[in-house]
C-alpha cells in the first residue's frame, strides 16, 4: 500500500507550507507557500544566517527592502528544489491600501526577476480584504498572478472568484479553532466547520465554472486533510506532510467537480462588507490574521535592523 501522501498526490496538488528548505527537499511538494510568520521562523534556521547577512548588506540600511530581499531570496532558494511556484506575501499592514498593495506586489516581482525568476513561477499573496481583492484583480490584468489568503468567509470566496484571482487559500484550521472556542464542542470529519467551508467554496466554484484554484490551508490534523482530498490544492505543514507520508492507510477522494453547488452571485462592495459584518467568525479571524502577520513582519524588520 502506498502512503496517504502519495495517494493524496493522485488527485490534489500538494503544496508545502514552510520556508524550511530541508523539509521541502525531503517531502517533494509541487509548490510552496510562505508568509511573514514562516519567514520569521526561517530567519532563525542556521542555514539562512549567511543569506540574512547578504540581504542586509545589499539593502544598505533599508529595512523594508531587506525584508523583501529576504523573502525573495528564500523563495528563489525554494524554487530550485520544487517544479512549481512559490507564494510570497505582501506586507499585511498594507491590507487596506490598494495603491500600496499594487506597488509592493510589483516591487516583489521585480526583485524576483532581478534574481532570474520569471513571474510565472511566483504567486503574490494578499489578504482577502476588499482592497486586497481589487488589487489582485488589477495585478491579474498585468500578468501577475495572485494568491488571496486569510480567507474565512463565503463572501470573500465569491468576491475573489468574480475578480478572476488565480488562487485562494481558505483557512480550515483557524475556522475550526474559532468554532471550537466559541461553542466548546469538538468537531471531526465532515462536521468540521473549516472542512464544510472549503467544501462549500469548492462546490460553488466548480458549479459556476470559475477557474480560480481552491487551495485549502491552515490544517490542525490529517483528518481535515483527508476530508478535503480532491481539492485543487492543499498547502500543508511539514509535520502533517510527514504524518501523511508515514501513514499507509487508504485515502479516498472526497471532493469531486460534479458535486452540486450554489447559484452564482456577484457581490457589490456594500454587499461584501455587509456579508462580512454578518459573519462574526470571518471578520474576527481576518482581523486577527492581519494583526498576527503584521506583528511578525515587524519582528522580521527588527531582526534586519538589529543585525545590520
UniProtKB/Swiss-Prot annotation:
The active site is at 125 (schiff-base intermediate with substrate). It is found in: Cytoplasm. This is Transaldolase. Transaldolase is important for the balance of metabolites in the pentose-phosphate pathway. Pathway: Carbohydrate degradation; pentose phosphate pathway; D-glyceraldehyde 3-phosphate and beta-D-fructose 6-phosphate from D-ribose 5-phosphate and D-xylulose 5-phosphate (non-oxidative stage): step 2/3. Its EC number is 2.2.1.2. Belongs to the transaldolase family. Type 1 subfamily. Pfam families: TAL_FSA. It comes from the Bacteria. Keywords: Cytoplasm, Pentose shunt, Schiff base, Transferase. Homodimer. GO terms for biological process: carbohydrate metabolic process; pentose-phosphate shunt. GO terms for cellular component: cytosol. It comes from Pseudomonas putida (strain W619). It catalyses: D-sedoheptulose 7-phosphate + D-glyceraldehyde 3-phosphate = D-erythrose 4-phosphate + beta-D-fructose 6-phosphate. GO terms for molecular function: transaldolase activity.
Amino acid at each position: 500500500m502506498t502512503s496517504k501522501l502519495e495517494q493524496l498526490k493522485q488527485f490534489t496538488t500538494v503544496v508545502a507550507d514552510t520556508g524550511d528548505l530541508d523539509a521541502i527537499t525531503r517531502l517533494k511538494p509541487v509548490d510552496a507557500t510562505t508568509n511573514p510568520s514562516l519567514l520569521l521562523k526561517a530567519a532563525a534556521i542556521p542555514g539562512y544566517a549567511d543569506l540574512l547577512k547578504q540581504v542586509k548588506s545589499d539593502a544598505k540600511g533599508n529595512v523594508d527592502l531587506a525584508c523583501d530581499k529576504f523573502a525573495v531570496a528564500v523563495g528563489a532558494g525554494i524554487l530550485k528544489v520544487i517544479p512549481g511556484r512559490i507564494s510570497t506575501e505582501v506586507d499585511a499592514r498594507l491590507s487596506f491600501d490598494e495603491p500600496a498593495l499594487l506597488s509592493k506586489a510589483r516591487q516583489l516581482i521585480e526583485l524576483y526577476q532581478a534574481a532570474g525568476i520569471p513571474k510565472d513561477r511566483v504567486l503574490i499573496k494578499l489578504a482577502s480584504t476588499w482592497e486586497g481583492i481589487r488589487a489582485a484583480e488589477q495585478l491579474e490584468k498585468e500578468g501577475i498572478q495572485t494568491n488571496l489568503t486569510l480567507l474565512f468567509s463565503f463572501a470573500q470566496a465569491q468576491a475573489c472568484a468574480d475578480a478572476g484571482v488565480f488562487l485562494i487559500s481558505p483557512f480550515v484550521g483557524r475556522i475550526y479553532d474559532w468554532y471550537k472556542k466559541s461553542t466548546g464542542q469538538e468537531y471531526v470529519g465532515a462536521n468540521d466547520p473549516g472542512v464544510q467551508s472549503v467544501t462549500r467554496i469548492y462546490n460553488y466554484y466548480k458549479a459556476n465554472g470559475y477557474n480560480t484554484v481552491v487551495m485549502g490551508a491552515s490544517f490542525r490534523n490529517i483528518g481535515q486533510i483527508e476530508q478535503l482530498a480532491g481539492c485543487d490544492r492543499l498547502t500543508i505543514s511539514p509535520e502533517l506532510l510527514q504524518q501523511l507520508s508515514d501513514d499507509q492507510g487508504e485515502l479516498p477522494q472526497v471532493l469531486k467537480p460534479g458535486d452540486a453547488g450554489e447559484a452564482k452571485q456577484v457581490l457589490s462592495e456594500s454587499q461584501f462588507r455587509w456579508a462580512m459584518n454578518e459573519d462574526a467568525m470571518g471578520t474576527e479571524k481576518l482581523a486577527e490574521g492581519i494583526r498576527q502577520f503584521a506583528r511578525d513582519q515587524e519582528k522580521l524588520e527588527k531582526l534586519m535592523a538589529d543585525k545590520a
